[in-house]
Amino acid sequence: MTEMAKGSVTHQRLIALLSQEGADFRVVTHEAVGKCEAVSEIRGTALGQGAKALVCKVKGNGVNQHVLAILAADQQADLSQLASHIGGLRASLASPAEVDELTGCVFGAIPPFSFHPKLKLVADPLLFERFDEIAFNAGMLDKSVILKTADYLRIAQPELVNFRRTA
């Protein structure tokens, strides 16, 4: 299956879920750009509204857990904080093959929803404190969703974990 076809399956699944749950959202089709700054400008949203999705692997202390870690696009992740919260000793970004297997998306197109039973969903709360809408790529690099923050929290139900880097 091509990258586009795989991402399309995730996109359709996401849109079906949001529609079924009565979410207040809109889909924006745009040029496929990889940088958070560029895509937020195209979407007409603030960088801090962007939900950056990192597929991580937490290991150590008997823990071997894949995590979909969501944070505001204007923040940096502190992977050691994330590992500590999950109960592991270290966290690293997953390989492209693991990202593909767990999300069906290419890096940069991953929505902040886990559709895989082995992918634990956590989110840094700052993403939800500053804006009443969040924005994210929706399985494909050329499609974004802008979604009411309250609907995201209600539907996705992420575990809220402070793991952003602080000065």
From Swiss-Prot:
Originating species:
Escherichia coli (strain K12)
Function summary: An aminoacyl-tRNA editing enzyme that deacylates Ser-tRNA and/or Thr-tRNA mischarged by lysyl-tRNA synthetase (LysRS), threonyl-tRNA synthetase (ThrRS), seryl-tRNA synthetase (SerRS), alanyl-tRNA synthetase (AlaRS), valyl-tRNA synthetase (ValRS) and isoleucyl-tRNA synthetase (IleRS) in vitro. Also deacylates mischarged Hse-tRNA(Lys) and Hse-tRNA(Ser), and cognate Ser-tRNA(Ser) and Thr-tRNA(Thr) in vitro. The presence of cognate ThrRS abolishes the Thr-tRNA(Thr) deacylase activity, hence this activity is not applicable physiologically.
Give disulfide pairs as residue numbers: none
Q: Which reaction does it catalyse?
A: L-seryl-tRNA(Lys) + H2O = tRNA(Lys) + L-serine; L-threonyl-tRNA(Lys) + H2O = tRNA(Lys) + L-threonine; L-homoseryl-tRNA(Lys) + H2O = tRNA(Lys) + L-homoserine + H(+); L-seryl-tRNA(Ala) + H2O = tRNA(Ala) + L-serine
Q: What is this protein called?
A: Multifunctional Ser/Thr-tRNA deacylase ProXp-y
Q: What is the lineage of its organism?
A: Bacteria, Pseudomonadati, Pseudomonadota, Gammaproteobacteria, Enterobacterales
- According to its UniProt record, this protein's enzyme class is hydrolase
Q: Name one GO biological process term.
A: positive regulation of translational fidelity
Q: EC number(s) on record?
A: 3.1.1.-
Domain of life assignment: Bacteria
- GO MF terms held by the record: aminoacyl-tRNA deacylase activity; hydrolase activity; Ser-tRNA(Ala) deacylase activity; tRNA binding
* Gene giving rise to this polypeptide: proXp-y
